[in-house]
């Protein structure tokens, strides 16, 4: 699978990149929302993992850009915000699942 990881925290980004790569996936990464939007609107990805709180534009805006581009690529939203309303907001914005950090 080809996976896009959009995560501003270098340690988390590298952890995900390494783990997914070792599992045999091709991984591209971005460290901010604007770069994430540029990459995420490309239909080549099978799955996207997007942090909710990113510099330049937040992860929910990245997810919205993906959906506005007409892409149905599955999106996993990562966030330290774990309240029920945070999860509901993420899913309503177009995320397919929501994972609370730390994991």
Which sequence ranges carry the predicted segments?
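N-terminal/domain-start alpha-helical segments
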Residues: 1-103
């Amino acid at each position: 699978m080809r996976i896009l990881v959009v995560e501003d925290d270098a340690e988390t980004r590298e952890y995900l990149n390494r783990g997914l790569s070792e599992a045999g996936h091709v991984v591209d990464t971005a460290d901010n929302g604007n770069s994430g939007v540029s990459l995420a609107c490309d239909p080549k990805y099978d799955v996207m993992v997007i942090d909710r709180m990113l510099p330049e534009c937040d992860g929910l805006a990245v997810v919205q850009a993906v959906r506005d581009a007409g892409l149905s690529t599955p999106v996993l939203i990562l966030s330290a915000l774990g309240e029920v309303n945070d999860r509901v907001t993420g899913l309503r914005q177009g995320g397919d699942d929501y994972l609370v950090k730390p994991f």
